[in-house]
Amino acid sequence: MNILLYMLFGFDKKQHKVLTELLAGLTTFIAMAYILVVNPSMLKVVGMDEGAAFTATLLAAVVGTLLCAIYAKLPYVQAPAMGPNAFFAFTICLSMGYSWQFALTGVLIEGILFVILSVTRVREWLAKLIPESIKIALGIGVGIFIAMLGLTNAHVIVADAGTIVGLGDIVHGEALLAIIGILITAILSVRRIPGALLIGIVLTTLIGIPLGVTKMPEHWVSLPPSLSPVFCQFDFSQVLTLDMLIVVLTMLSMDIFDTLGTILALTSKTGQLPPKTFNRALMCDALATTVGAM
């Protein structure tokens, strides 16, 4: 078993424990599971089938994460990012007026360019050119964005005409539960309780039941919705247009700096990656982007 784990994931029993890895994987899954709800709901706004978008989101996350685990041998989860998804839905489709098929074609082209840049190591070269201060800022920026996303979804902060961002109703519903969850997780983390994040998520979910926030599912097990309504639904009729060029270049730049920012933020805690591993991590992200477009 240890030999198999080492061959697949670079697992070393002297440095790692199976129970710790399982706990970390479960915690990461629960922390990332919101994407399975948020991403399809965003794509539904532009006309995509929500059930098919759910299945596509799930498959893209599975493919990206397995690539990272087996090929790059890194404990990183890959899934559709909220920034590019918001640009996909609200800018390309709603603001620019294009169909989601047009936007999906842009993602496919951007993903292919992403792979080419990774193969030629252009992204590795870009990473070396980034000053240390910008590397730190990228990690902080990603963290602030995720925090803003969570606080907004929980209605702790809301849009305000005067101050842009305002405080929501924090004594009721989702906002109250979010604050309780943050406090529980923070206390457990400060006390260095093993599995603090997982325990915090579970306790917050249970507390949400009497508050009426946590909804119990109608069915505990079911087959995933069909992928066919969105599978390979591309529109190549407007590939050679200025708007497509703008879309591709914008999404490419977002992906490059989002990926570099995330990896650099993670390595600030775990130590620098060897060049070979770093290149493989970039390639995994590029391949996952291309597969996700399909």
Language model feature labels by segment:
Residues 158-172, 210-253:
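Helix-loop-helix junctions that connect adjacent transmembrane segments
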Residues 21-38, 107, 240-261:
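Core transmembrane alpha-helical segments of multi-pass membrane transporters/permeases
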Residues 1-17:
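Short, Lys/Arg-rich, polar N-terminal cytosolic tail immediately upstream
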Residues 18-23, 104, 138, 238-250, ...:
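Select transmembrane alpha-helical segments in multipass membrane proteins
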Residues 62-70, 90-91, 115, 183-187, ...:
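Alpha-helical transmembrane segments of multipass membrane proteins
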Residues 183-226, 252-256:
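Flexible hinge motifs at transmembrane-helix junctions and intramembrane kinks/re-entrant loops
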Residues 23-170:
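Early transmembrane hairpin of solute transport permeases
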Residues 14, 43-59, 63, 249-294:
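Membrane-embedded helical hairpins/re-entrant loop segments and their flanking transmembrane helices
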